[in-house]
Amino acid sequence: MDGLETALPSLTDNASLAYSEQCGQETPLENMLFACFYLLDFILAFVGNALALWLFIWDHKSGTPANVFLMHLAVADLSCVLVLPTRLVYHFSGNHWPFGEIPCRLTGFLFYLNMYASIYFLTCISADRFLAIVHPVKSLKLRRPLYAHLACAFLWIVVAVAMAPLLVSPQTVQTNHTVVCLQLYREKASHHALASLAVAFTFPFITTVTCYLLIIRSLRQGPRIEKHLKNKAVRMIAMVLAIFLICFVPYHIHRSVYVLHYRGGGTSCSAQRALALGNRITSCLTSLNGALDPVMYFFVAEKFRHALCNLLCSKRLTGPPPSFEGKTNESSLSARSEL
């Protein structure tokens, strides 16, 4: 993960950074566009995840592993959203970081902590769906809310420890009378980052894709599974994979290219500018995850959609709310954990 690749910048690094900053400097138009994007993203993600977290806590009696993972995902998204205003100020200030060293470290720490926590919670949701649909009987003892909470606590600790170097190493550099926070698009480019990327992203991404491929195979071979459960599973697969492909895959692919070529001796100024712009755009896409997850909750989770409609419409919907416990046929044993 990016925290593992952070090191103390040397004088040579600062000289290289100054040159790179001149090549990769944002234009006034780019600053305006990025600021508008982060403002809209902040509003949508904050409202969506705050509402989602409130609904998940309010509906805690459901007591399912899926709800536990979704609740922690909402916490991660909400925490990540809270650092977006610093990026707003950065772009409105013309690429200047006015907050100092400690806030820069905290911004980078919280951004990467919650981004990778979100990735792993999405992977946990995929694994839970796999167990519920493919092994509904065998997984009943394993899929308990307590175990889900323990898994989430373990993931929070592991990711926090991996990101901890961001809190203890200098992250600001002054170039041309402008203070630069290295955690805003200028992360240290190190070849050690490639191994970090493989551990932090490749493993959960492959796990998620594998789980959903096995789910699809099980759905195609399981004619007794009710049609609406099949449709719900397909929607879940499509939404989670879309979030991965839109928010995380572009960033990590570009990050690999960025690590290999940015600030390299043979990299031209125009190439550095293209890499820097790509880094900013893909970083924007990662923050979009906070706005897309509530959309996933709405289209995939019936109880979330029902509660949200009740809240917004101020009236009860006709018909009974979706039940996690109301299925009786063999194929619906996984209904206890339905979203």
UniProtKB/Swiss-Prot annotation:
Tissue specificity remark: Expressed in brain, kidney, and heart. Highest level in brain.
Extracellular topological intervals: 1-36, 86-105, 169-195, 254-280
Keyword Transmembrane helix found: yes
Known glycosylation sites: 14, 176
Membrane-topology descriptor: Multi-pass membrane protein
A Pfam cross-reference name: 7tm_1
Domain of life: Eukaryota
Compartments in which it is found: Cell membrane
Cytoplasmic side: 58-64, 127-147, 217-232, 302-339
Disulfide bonds: 104-181
A GO biological-process term: oligodendrocyte differentiation
InterPro entries referenced in this protein's UniProt entry, alphabetically: GPCR_Rhodpsn, GPCR_Rhodpsn_7TM
A Gene Ontology term for the protein's cellular component: plasma membrane
GO molecular function, one term: G protein-coupled receptor activity
Keywords: Cell membrane, Disulfide bond, G-protein coupled receptor, Glycoprotein, Membrane, Receptor, Transducer, Transmembrane, Transmembrane helix
Induction of the gene: In brain areas affected by ischemia.
Transmembrane feature ranges: 37-57, 65-85, 106-126, 148-168, 196-216, 233-253, 281-301
Family: Belongs to the G-protein coupled receptor 1 family.
Role according to the record: Dual specificity receptor for uracil nucleotides and cysteinyl leukotrienes (CysLTs). Signals through G(i) and inhibition of adenylyl cyclase. May mediate brain damage by nucleotides and CysLTs following ischemia.
Other facts: Administration of an antisense oligonucleotide specific for GPR17 significantly reduced brain damage following ischemia.
Protein name: Uracil nucleotide/cysteinyl leukotriene receptor
Organism, scientific name: Rattus norvegicus (Rat)
